[in-house]
Amino acid sequence: DIGAMSVSESLRGDVTALKQGAKNLNDGISMIQMADGALSEQSSILIRLREITTQSATGTIGNVERVSLQLEFSALRSEFDRIAHSTEFNGRKLLDGSLAASASDTTVLQLGLDSSDNNRFDLNQKINLTATTSSALGFSTDSIATDTGALTAMGNLATAIEKLSVIRGRVGAVLK
């Protein structure tokens, strides 16, 4: 029966498309988990940066200790930026602003049978993962080699921690 065969082929096509949609969803979840893991590492670095900045701001240490703390600060900031610039999923950068709502090239997951909004998930709009570089978060030029520089850095790092927490919250909300 030609009619039954047509219906059968149509349903088979739908099943195949829905299976691919499930795979697309799983890939999207993996991508978000990758970003979340990198953001967690960056968060740990920010906490350590704040700790050594607080140490450098005290009047009980000398210049030699501050120079040593500045070296660690610079190394950690470089690692922070390396994570932001190198974290990717299937060649797609994750923490450089590519997943921000304002990005021109968006990442949309096709989940269903047609192109309606109900069958597509726009990661950029849902996550709005803005760049997480030291420059974007406002501490790229900080120096803790002096106590006054450390005091300035403390304020900038507090703001950076707050901004990163907001970003992580959006990522976590999408994962739930």
Descriptions of predicted regions:
Residues 1-176:
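Primary detection of the long, small/polar-rich alpha-helical "axial" segments characteristic
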